[in-house]
Structures are given as structure tokens and as C-alpha cells.
Amino acid sequence: RAALADSGFTLEQWVIFASIVQKESASVEEMYNVSSVFHNRLSNASEYPMLQSCTTNNFIWDYVEPYYNDNVPQAVLDAYDTYDRNGLPIGAIANAGLDAFDASLHPNDTPYYFFVTDVERTHYYGRTYQEHLANIEKAKAVNAKYGINGLVTG
């Protein structure tokens, strides 16, 4: 309880945050770095107001959209689109495991604000947008070995 109180998260925000960490991470070890990226963004909201998590958008298309028969209301899209919405989405996008909850409260101390993942689930972290663009090219090169043109999200 003390760690949650010290985090600045409400219980609901912690559940939402941990669900994103769960979906974005390829392994338990990566959860702590992924958590760090999102903590860094939330802590520097003037420069990085949006989490920009692909998994929140994937949640819309994979789980919400089928119920709306290709006609998702804009308010629903806006509630989960972390490329267009500041801060956390309105709700959790998955059931987080204990490791994701722990990583959400105890992120690694990193300078990173960006990450991208290739099809092999290797994470590439960057401090700047320029580093992120270079990492995207690295991920695309790995993906191309598997016949994938571009990035795979979520």
C-alpha cells in the first residue's frame, strides 16, 4: 500500500498503467524498462503529454470494434487512443499479472522516452526522437528478415 501511495497513482490508474505494461512487454525483465518509459513520459508531460502506446489502440480494434460493427463512436476511440489523448486511457486494456503491477510501482531508472519492438520481441529504447527513428529502422530490418514490411504493433 505504501508503494502505491508513494507512486501518485490511484488504484484505478495503477490497474490501467499495469495493463499497458503487461501488453507492451515481451518478458518480465522488459516490464521494468517499459514501465520506466511510461513513467518518464508521465513525469515530463509538458514535453511528452501522450503515452503513445500501440497496445491501447490495438485494444480498440481487437476487442472494442467488433461490438460496434465497424462503427466505433469517436468518444470511445478518444478514450483509448494514447497517440491522441494525454495521459492514461480511460480503462485497463488487459488483465495485468503481478509482475506488471510490481514493475508499474518499481520501474527501472532509465533516461528513455521511447521504445519500439521487433517481431522477435526485442525492445529498442531511445532517449530522443532521433534515437527512436533509428531504432525503428533497426526493428524494420529484423522484421524484413521474416518478410514483414514495417512494424508489428502490440
Which functions belong to the PLM regions below?
Residues R1-G154:
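Bacterial extracytoplasmic/cell-wall-associated proteins, especially those involved in peptidoglycan
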